[in-house]
């Protein structure tokens, strides 16, 4: 039985974490002994981890990192992690150099600075593994590179490398040492290889895995909008972070309201910008028009019930929220940026817009006043996702009803095949 370790930063309800859960389900417990290490000991999705996966954390807090209680716990964890194994002292020069670089660029990413320390102060794993897989950038990647004993080491990238704030100096050029590097989209791959061209021969695209039928099933469960609103509904799903550019969406909603459009915009997600966004909403008098609903355990009824799904972000890797919207046949409008361009074919299965309040509002009006076009985009998007799923299963050699499918999938993964 082969021993495999997966490492992820946290196990919260974001897209990469959900994709990891789906990937874990593809491994046979009869063939693999699977360990999971959550670097920061926290995240609400722990209860969805397959029962045959062994959580190696000595302590674990099953609370969202975005909730009030979760933020408090996360802060304590980070504080206590500064001191073990001399992590802070050992990385002091590293911190100063990278902080200086960030200050020159006027883009300070505190989380990126701290990942090295979080990695160096993590658990000491004495077990030898056949495969160790870092499923996220930053801490998980550093931990697998520096602190795991394994015959083969793989890592995943889920974001546009440079836009997200990573650099060779920040990573200490660790990527060439990995046996295989998987990116979730072609654009993520291209962005990464601009920084690490020497890794071209070992970098493959491995699309996020989604359980399409489970998403459709959950979309039919009770839930969704409960405000009785009779106008058009716009939905966005994602964490409240700078990457998602919600301030631009709020400004677009203001333009729509000023023009008399009968539309309401709903956001599912939590994050550090909640208070700031709430203030902006109040300043523009949009309390009844742009609603921050928080995180939802089952967001899929909202997708099914909305008139338009909008994902106007600064950059993406490959958005699982957009994939889910397409699976459910939503009309999708996304900003013209890395990641989004790869997911939506403008004028075929969705629409692209500039990350500008005026352009967003104009594209929204065009779509909401053209039911025939919306239906076309929704049909084409759902059809495309069905075909993509089939293509991925073919490459992964998984066909329903065959007992050997998991073995084939794992054998392919061992030989570095990718899912497309």
Residue ranges of model-derived segments:
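A short, well-ordered alpha-helix in the C-terminal region of glycosyltransferases
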Residues: 257, 282, 359, 366, ...
